[in-house]
Amino acid sequence: MDMSIRQALLKNFMGNSPDWYKLAIITFLIINPLIFFFVDPFIAGWLLVVEFIFTLAMALKCYPLQPGGLLAIEAVIIGMTTPKQIGHEIANNLEVILLLVFMVAGIYFMKQLLLFAFTKLLLSIRSKRLLSLAFCFASAFLSAFLDALTVIAVVISVSLGFYSIYHNFASNQADAELSNDGFIDSTEKKQTLEQFRAFLRSLMMHAGVGTALGGVMTMVGEPQNLIIAKHLEWDFVTFFIRMSPVTIPVFFAGLAVCYLVERFKLFGYGAELPELVRKVLTDYDKKNSEKRTQQEKAQLLIQALIGIWLIVALALHLAEVGIIGLSVIILATTFCGITEEHALGKAFEEALPFTALLTVFFSVVAVIIDQQLFGPIIQFVLQASESSQLSLFYLFNGLLSAISDNVFVGTVYISEALSALQEGLISQSQYEHIGVAINTGTNLPSVATPNGQAAFLFLLTSALSPLIRLSYGRMVMMALPYTIVMTLLGLLAVEFWLVPMTHWLYEIGLIAIP
């Protein structure tokens, strides 16, 4: 039956999103101006923030750029903020945009090396506990220097490749549909596949948490870290040292959790790699290694050298992060022979949707600033004692980051803390301590749900998740031991260790007195 133009417009609006979600967004767009003009701009502003967080929580139904962008456009039209204020926020955070555009694209051209490393890791370590620790540690180390999304994308590629190799073997089909187990006729092969799925689920979760453990440590580990570092005027090394009283204990606690859940087979962990699967994968890798050409070996060597350049350039702060990322693109493409525009364009596909979404974040931050929405919360926090302020900032950030995007939350709170400093409500020293509390608060508790960590959301929405039966609920359950330990230890560190350890770092001359 032919549909009318009205029906076609409604069908096209937000694509395949559920009808109730489309209706909710339309309702928001209708009531926001009414409340802004006829009730109270402050209430309307808070309603917009809640609605925006709701769109982030519904990321699996519809990417937040569309519904969040509509809300942001309307906010400008009705006068909640101005294009000038949004432009000011974007200009202040240009480094973050350059990080997402150039660094993520740069690492894309090093995927070949990362795939090689993770493949060798998986096949060379037979102990599941050691392998889990290795994946968690490797993901943490890489995420401290690279983008967490890229790291998890590489681990997904490795796992998806291995899954397809065994699935094709088990189904006796060279190009079998990966989601179809109907061709697997043997009960033993089906049981082996289920065990392999459980094995891959646990590895993916360890790697995902590893990106959070490493990502919190450095200014390039997560996008919000760079925003916080810019507000605090810290370079790469200073940021790492200032965060260390909280991040180092939490890192080792995270590794301990990784070992314990595997040792005692808790929360869905503990599945071993079946011997049959190991043999199939090892044979496949051996054939691939024998077929590797001298040209491909040279590409791996070049990528390893570029990796060393990346770490040195970041550690010595030789240029802005985005510029270093651009240098990686130029070096990797030049010496690996990638010169076609089409091939270059693929590298930017991963980051640009999130870059656009980040710009919408800045629009909502502009509304928060213009309408002074966080004034009462900040006043409440600043009325507490200095030590309690740190815990409150950590907890408020952690709570919001678990249900919303941590880039958005971190940006809002560090902006408010800077305003408090400029108004003379807090000292420079306290402002820096609050910066640590905000950074750790946005990064550590956010592993609780896929909404908080972009890497987790990327994993959940990947082609791998349905194949290994990794649902939203299962991710939350498997992340639970990490969430509890990392959140509580982070809170203890902020409350009891941060200030005395920072003073000790002053005394031994590792950081300068503000």
Curated annotation (Swiss-Prot):
Official protein name in the record: Na(+)/H(+) antiporter NhaB
Similarity comment text for this entry: Belongs to the NhaB Na(+)/H(+) (TC 2.A.34) antiporter family.
Bilayer topology annotation: Multi-pass membrane protein
Species whose genome carries this gene: Proteus mirabilis (strain HI4320)
Residue intervals passing through the bilayer: 13-33, 34-54, 96-116, 136-156, 203-223, 236-256, 304-324, 349-369, 392-412, 448-468, 479-499
Principal cellular location given in the protein's record: membrane
Subcellular location: Cell inner membrane
Record has Transmembrane helix as a keyword: yes
A GO term from the CC aspect: plasma membrane
Lineage of source species: Bacteria, Pseudomonadati, Pseudomonadota, Gammaproteobacteria, Enterobacterales
